[in-house]
Amino acid sequence: MSEDHGKDYTLEADSELRFEIEHKDAKVLVSLVSGFAELFGTELVKKKQYEFGVGAKVAIFTYQGCVLHVSGKMDVCYISKETPMVQYVNCHTALEQFRMEAEEKDRHGPVAMVVGPMDVGKSTLCRILLNYAVRVGRRPLYADLDVGQGSIAISGNVATILIERPANVEEGFSKTAPLVYHFGHKSPGANSILYNAVVSKMAEVTLHSLNSNKRTKSSGIIINTCGWVKGSGYAHLLHAAKAYGACAIFVLDQERLYNELLRDVPKGVHVVLLPKSGGVVERSKEQRHEARDQRVKEYFYGNARAPFYPFSFEVKFQDLRLYKIGAPPLPDSCMPLGMKAEDNKTKVVAVTPTPALIHHVLALSFSESVEDDVIGTNVAGFCCVTEVDMERQAVMLLSPQPRPLPPNALLLWSELQFMDNHT
């Protein structure tokens, strides 16, 4: 569908305008002409023009009715009156009740998890709940446990940020000063023991940090989770709920998961089944891969509105302190006395540079030694291996910071790869 000269869309109360952009060079401009509207919980400013590009899947909702002016090339564009936004705002109202009680009694605010299979709108619901909380003066923490399609850090990591202002309509939440823990894989199943250890550590630190500010303490935490909800994936959800002490679990679009959680979580935990929005779009494997790639590209190069200019520099093998968490499995009979096979899953092992290292993203740990708690230490940032020269015994790194690497820099291997073809 092509909208070359622009068009006004009149929305009735409790309806939303949905559109998708798939063409690479397409650009869609939206402005609020009259009334009130919001995008995933962020209010639109009247007469201000918002720009959306390729990959955008937008749903602009109005509680009272509005007129929107839209111009540009869209693949899909329609108005829907079937929207779960009223149920989502009811969830916010319930959480706000918990926050008011926590404020009165000087206790931790609610910890709410959003769970469900892939492509049901989990991160969107998190964004809505966080935006609504901020709009009534709260300062919640946002924890993202989705290592496949993270919304705070690049894939292969879990992360937490403090939300102090509503998400930017075009770019989402500010990613300033996130707390990031390295996992190194795109699925928890690659190393379940390590994933649980990393989640437990981040939960411990996040819950402790609630005490640093009275407003944050009563505001609580919103947690986004992976879309793997069966077998070991379900066990990871239970582990996260226990580690964070979740008091509410919002289940999107899966009755089976809802009933399993009702059966398995403590009686005091509120489990709520919610419908997914009709605007949620299923993504193919290729689209997921592209989204991961785009996140890494933005980490190093920024975007059109705020470009970054990363550095490339050489590091000799002898100066490279490179490790991987998790050693190949061994049978119990081959393990040292007192060690179990699963201990290998959290072992920090040295990595010898080879040409296979090219394109891999490496995490820079705040740990200075492998004697430290490497798993329980957050990371400072990331770099990418763009070249491996076996003859010169050196690697070329793409980094947001200029040379040299920090003294005692400890780099952690990740299975995430990024082809740096930026020109």
UniProtKB/Swiss-Prot annotation:
CDD domains: SIMIBI (cd01983). The keyword Nucleus applies. GO terms for biological process: mRNA 3'-end processing; tRNA splicing, via endonucleolytic cleavage and ligation. GO terms for molecular function: ATP binding; polynucleotide 5'-hydroxyl-kinase activity. Its main location: nucleus. One of its GO terms (cellular component) is tRNA-intron endonuclease complex. It is found in: Nucleus. Keywords: ATP-binding, mRNA processing, Nucleotide-binding, Nucleus. ATP binds at E16, K57, D119, V120, G121, K122, S123, T124. InterPro entries: Clp1 (IPR028606), Clp1/Grc3 (IPR045116), Clp1_C (IPR010655), Clp1_C_sf (IPR038238), Clp1_N (IPR032324), Clp1_N_sf (IPR038239), CLP1_P (IPR032319), P-loop_NTPase (IPR027417). Required for endonucleolytic cleavage during polyadenylation-dependent pre-mRNA 3'-end formation. Belongs to the Clp1 family. Clp1 subfamily. This is Protein CLP1 homolog. It comes from Drosophila erecta. The gene is cbc.
